Amino acid sequence: MIQPQTHLNVADNSGARELMCIRIIGASNRRYAHIGDVIVAVIKEAVPNMPLERSEVIRAVIVRTCKELKRDNGMIIRYDDNAAVVIDQEGNPKGTRVFGAIARELRQLSFTKIVSLAPEVL
């Protein structure tokens, strides 16, 4: 469960390393974000000499959470970290690579480009 002020790792090569959630896109009063939700975040740590810089406000989609994700078939998935992929206004990833495993639910939420870049889909 991701809420405002939560720090997340970045799972792509866009130039950001760490994000902090400042808003959850969707209903006006949503408290938590889960896998597949789009958030507004600020970059807390960035790689030098890259297009994205520290303190820049961006959008990101959550791809991994420490909180368990329960599927309809009873399977429970839990990751070791909270991670997100930086996206643009159209929902396309800004990076060209995605690191680590991501959940299959992203394909159903029309983030197919992120799924195709991922090395492993659980």
From Swiss-Prot:
Subunit architecture: Part of the 50S ribosomal subunit.
GO MF annotations in UniProt: large ribosomal subunit rRNA binding; structural constituent of ribosome
Family: Belongs to the universal ribosomal protein uL14 family.
Gene3D superfamilies from the UniProt entry: Ribosomal protein L14 (2.40.150.20)
A Gene Ontology BP annotation from the UniProt entry: translation
Keywords (A to Z) from UniProt: Chloroplast, Plastid, Ribonucleoprotein, Ribosomal protein, RNA-binding, rRNA-binding
Encoding gene per record: rpl14
Gene Ontology cellular-component terms listed: chloroplast; cytosolic large ribosomal subunit
Signal peptide positions on this chain: none
Protein's UniProt name: Large ribosomal subunit protein uL14c
Main location class: plastid
Task of the protein: Binds to 23S rRNA.
Source organism, top-level taxon: Eukaryota
UniProt-annotated location(s): Plastid, Chloroplast
